[in-house]
Amino acid sequence: MKKRIDYLSNKQNKYSIRRFTVGTTSVIVGATILFGIGNHQAQASEQSNDTTQSSKNNASADSEKNNMIETPQLNTTANDTSDISANTNSANVDSTTKPMSTQTSNTTTTEPASTNETPQPTAIKNQATAAKMQDQTVPQEANSQVDNKTTNDANSIATNSELKNSQTLDLPQSSPQTISNAQGTSKPSVRTRAVRSLAVAEPVVNAADAKGTNVNDKVTASNFKLEKTTFDPNQSGNTFMAANFTVTDKVKSGDYFTAKLPDSLTGNGDVDYSNSNNTMPIADIKSTNGDVVAKATYDILTKTYTFVFTDYVNNKENINGQFSLPLFTDRAKAPKSGTYDANINIADEMFNNKITYNYSSPIAGIDKPNGANISSQIIGVDTASGQNTYKQTVFVNPKQRVLGNTWVYIKGYQDKIEESSGKVSATDTKLRIFEVNDTSKLSDSYYADPNDSNLKEVTDQFKNRIYYEHPNVASIKFGDITKTYVVLVEGHYDNTGKNLKTQVIQENVDPVTNRDYSIFGWNNENVVRYGGGSADGDSAVNPKDPTPGPPVDPEPSPDPEPEPTPDPEPSPDPEPEPSPDPDPDSDSDSDSGSDSDSGSDSDSESDSDSDSDSDSDSDSDSESDSDSESDSDSDSDSDSDSDSDSESDSDSDSDSDSDSDSDSESDSDSESDSESDSDSDSDSDSDSDSDSDSDSDSDSDSDSDSDSDSDSESDSDSDSDSDSDSDSDSDSDSDSDSDSDSDSDSDSDSDSDSDSDSDSDSDSDSDSDSDSDSDSDSDSDSDSDSDSDSDSDSDSDSDSDSDSRVTPPNNEQKAPSNPKGEVNHSNKVSKQHKTDALPETGDKSENTNATLFGAMMALLGSLLLFRKRKQDHKEKA
């Protein structure tokens, strides 16, 4: 083990340090001037930064413009009076004929099952706008398919002749999007489906407030039957239950009996009584003379009918009666097609039944890879409270296809606004949009629970993509999609007495070619009738065939410019992210904070070939603005990984020739935030308030847990086992507990300006955990010369990969030293321009004197260095 034979006094050592520092500084200053890093380069760098910033600002401005373009506005161009279908811009139209695929199903009423109504043609029109769409024709092949329950001859008609069917596709005017390159345009396919009819009766006195006695034990039911046990609720299917009842004993006015439905059935159908105390009035039970024998109500929550006798039964015996009531599916309790228990309790007597629901599939659309597909159902209409609300469920892209430029239109009418009581507007309509995780788990009944884990609400993502620019229409821009969505509509209708008619339309293109325009629509209608009962008018009707597909301009028109996509808002430059530690052998954690005007991101790695095992993990989160000029001529092999995300404001001139492995952490709110892991043989000159002149030779394996507040008052609580030779001229308050194999155990608290020469042979096997928190708000001048001639042979090569913001004095900027030639790639323009070397832009004539002066300074520094080395050699000798 090498020992320090001689050691200079503090004064001499201090002088030699300063002399060596001057020599090193002279070399650096001379080299700097010699190589001509002058003011002009700094100016050029600043100009380049300005240019870059200007470009960035311009890009931001362009982004703002694009954002403005992205938001559709009404009446922004002269073409806004044209219908959406006119915006197909059918350039390069295929001359081949395309099949017309029209599927039509049944419309229903809310009258009893025997009443049918024929719907109007299901052409998608908007009669609210004054402008008319240009009549256009396209040769297509007719392939019409009509499905209904009363006609089984679903014929497929195909002709070789070119049928020019001019269909008016009056979608909302001034659509906020444009379908470009319509190729192979599919004919709009509209499927008409009315939801189950509404079970509505004339307003009667509620029997819910029955105050008499439950006389279920005095009532006997008989001849129970269900009209049918299999039907399609999505095609207005329902059934009726009929039963006779006999009162076997005397009853009086106010007495009542009950009937209860199972979970799979409801008595109210799609009528919503949640705003009417969840109570539905039922038609009175009357005698042949028209006298009211009993009044009835239906409790929505308990699914219980209550029949309350009137004073007609007073003093009467052998009372007989019968009732027939419509029954509907419970969409929530029977969400899938299948057979369910339908056990009905009448006057405490159970009638066991089975009911089978064959829901027509909600997955419908154009049968081609990028065909539009959408369906909907009205699942609740408030007809009793006067609030005039309805609820609708819409399945968007239930086939889960890859679609481009997808738009969905939710309309409060079908063909003509004046023929529907629906109201769709920003004030009358509330939309909630959900993304479906697993399409196979969607219900067949259109019931969608917002709390279902299979649904993820994404309404906030569509806040700026829902438009109410057209009368009675909500337009939703889905864009390019691959998933299925559920839209829950809470709407209103007026009290004009018209049927509630709604329509949903989806249109899209092939996302790959931006062609192959496709459109598909779906109609719903609820017919409300007040009468002597309630029924689910689910009768099958033959709707008229919709007229053919969208008008297409036979003349090729130029391809429209693609719809601008919104540029992301310019985001502020992110904070510099600290580079990951490459796993140093050290573990110190410093959470320090300093106030800085600049940001330096130093990512340094050093490799230490030493016997000192420093296990530190330093995490310095400081901010400083370093206005410093530092020249580190170090030969250190440090196995350290310091990640400093710091901004230091230090006005220091440090010249370190260090051969060290130090694990230190300083948080300087003042002038420097240095986070190093090194074993230092350092000669540093820092402009600080404390002047520490120490020469220590430590052959130690120490881990220091120090908490120093360097206003150059350091309080070090260390546990070290050291073979050290230290000479400190410092203002230090050291509370040290050193355990050395050299028979010295010192627990001292000293404030010393001491000259200690310890030549000890100690085997230090210490393990200390350094958790230091140093807060230096100081101006310190540290002149230290530490020579570690220890068992840690640090013949090191320090590799510093740093990215720092440095503003040299006098506008001089130095290229960072990079011994190993590694490059740090930064994403910030400001950092790149400050670290990349720039070409010389100044006048060469101005650098002539600077070159001469630099050479002289370098020579002077070399002489001083040589003198120092010689003196050191003599001292060692």
Curated annotation (Swiss-Prot):
This is Clumping factor B. Cell surface-associated protein implicated in virulence by promoting bacterial attachment to both alpha- and beta-chains of human fibrinogen and inducing the formation of bacterial clumps. Residues 1-44 form the signal peptide. The modification Pentaglycyl murein peptidoglycan amidated threonine is found at T841. A motif (LPXTG sorting signal) lies at residues 838-842. Residues 842-877 form a propeptide. One of its GO terms (cellular component) is extracellular region. Keywords: Cell wall, Peptidoglycan-anchor, Secreted, Signal, Virulence. The Asp/Ser-rich domain functions as a stalk to allow the ligand binding domain to be displayed in a functional form on the cell surface. SUPFAM superfamilies: Bacterial adhesins. Residues 556-801 have a biased composition (Acidic residues). It is found in: Secreted, Cell wall. Residues 45-542 are annotated as: Ligand binding A region. The gene is clfB. Residues 545-555 have a biased composition (Pro residues). A motif (YSIRK-G/S signaling motif) lies at residues 15-26.
